[in-house]
Amino acid sequence: MQDLVIRRPDDWHLHLRDGGMLRGVIADTSRHFARAIIMPNLVPPVVTSADAAAYRERILAAIPAGDRFEPLMTLYLTEGTDPGDVEAGFRSGLVKAVKLYPAGATTNSSSGVRDIDKAMPVLERMAEIGLPLCVHGEVTTAEVDIFDREAVFIETVLDPLRRRLPDLRITMEHVTTKDGVDYIREHAANLAGSITTHHLIINRNAILVGGIKPHYYCLPVAKREAHRLALRQAAISGDVRFFLGTDSAPHVDPLKECACGCAGIYTSINTLSCLAHVFEEEGALDRLEAFTSLNGPAWYGLPANEETITLRKQEEPVSYPARIETEAGPVTVFDPMFPLHWAVTQA
């Protein structure tokens, strides 16, 4: 057996949903993670500081007794977002970031931004006060191929925005392409990127080869193998601009296994086992802690966690359920398509 001790990790991009789903999935995160940036794309979305405060209370009420977990709240950017409310939420310590969803880009994004100019007053205020903007980096215009959405977003939205507001701190969330990795590496100032567990493991073949596999469908969609390999190199590099954001996104199985299935992969329960496998495979276990526990806090201006967790490599594969049951219905767990031998033994 082999033990690996790392500081307790954080998740810098997490969907907890609400109600019965929230109560069903929260323990899979709070068991191992200290903090998480909580996505605001509920129905209705978390638009105001009051919305965020109320949602935070619902999350805290759902955390199992004995778990120590802090939800880091975000606001859903709209073309009518009030800069004063955003600043007040930030100054109070409640709001840690604002999320830009291009309208129609992903689950519950219909209230998102269609014209970036209409959101400039709040973006300018965020640049002034140092509040990060988290972006879903895809365009949604019909003429752009779905596999090119990220590259086109960088060229037509992100780069012009950064030139217009160079002091705005931007997290390019769930980077999925070599284009995204290279852009972050080449533009050091006020730019970082989160990487999901599943994009380090699957490429688009996982979705399409041998039949449609809806439980590997997510947005941004998995890309070619060359992009997956670029993501791996970024994750294991130790570069402080790259960190874990699982984008773990639960949907009940009937909404995934249908003619128009939802986008999202549920990875919270086995993310650390998957990541230990990936980093060991790349000969980079010594840099797992940076990716999961150090780089994210540094970017968001928070201290690294003092507590530690222990990952133990064992001969027998770790057993995870194929699905979890929630009050909302069954949720299929991400299958990495290889056995997992790293287990969290102390958290």
Curated annotation (Swiss-Prot):
User: Which PROSITE patterns does this entry report, sorted A to Z?
Assistant: DIHYDROOROTASE_1, DIHYDROOROTASE_2
Q: What residues bind Zn(2+) 1, as annotated? A: 13, 15, 99, 247
Query: What is the name of the protein in this document?
Result: Dihydroorotase
The Swiss-Prot or TrEMBL record lists the needed cofactor(s) as: Zn(2+)
Carrying N6-carboxylysine, the residues are 99
What catalytic reaction does the record list?
Answer: (S)-dihydroorotate + H2O = N-carbamoyl-L-aspartate + H(+)
Q: Pathway involvement?
A: Pyrimidine metabolism; UMP biosynthesis via de novo pathway; (S)-dihydroorotate from bicarbonate: step 3/3
Q: What does this protein do?
A: Catalyzes the reversible cyclization of carbamoyl aspartate to dihydroorotate.
The family annotation for this protein states: Belongs to the metallo-dependent hydrolases superfamily. DHOase family. Class II DHOase subfamily.
Catalytic residues at: 247
**Gene Ontology CC terms, in alphabetical order:** cytosol
